[in-house]
């Protein structure tokens, strides 16, 4: 018997927070970490972080539970230019409960579309989230 894919809606206050985050003027790294409220079947805010490096962000993620992250990253280009790409990172660690993984996987695209993001990455181990990994991923876009 196969379970139908659950697609969770995005909480209204989170939609507004993501919209504001997209147009923020600050020049430091920042992150919005989101989780699924499985009773409400809603993607909700877990925590907001300011001035956080990829390595510090990694330390905030649970090792056995999925999370969605929207990360504003100060990207220093080789030619000296600076940009602030918004990255969507789906943290789906090995060892999560299968039903939890399916709920997050089923809701990922809706959240990406809601947040209007194009730089979408996935990690299967929170330890993979490093500055080097992120710069390598962003290198494909710049």
Swiss-Prot record:
Post-translational modification: Phosphorylated; stimulated by phorbol ester.
InterPro entries recorded: ADF-H, ADF-H/Gelsolin-like_dom_sf, GMF
Any Pfam family: Cofilin_ADF
UniProt-recorded Gene Ontology molecular function terms: actin binding; Arp2/3 complex binding; growth factor activity
Cysteine pairings via disulfide bonds: none
UniProt keyword Chaperone, yes or no: no
Function (record text): This protein causes differentiation of brain cells, stimulation of neural regeneration, and inhibition of proliferation of tumor cells.
Name of the featured protein: Glia maturation factor beta
Organism (species): Mus musculus
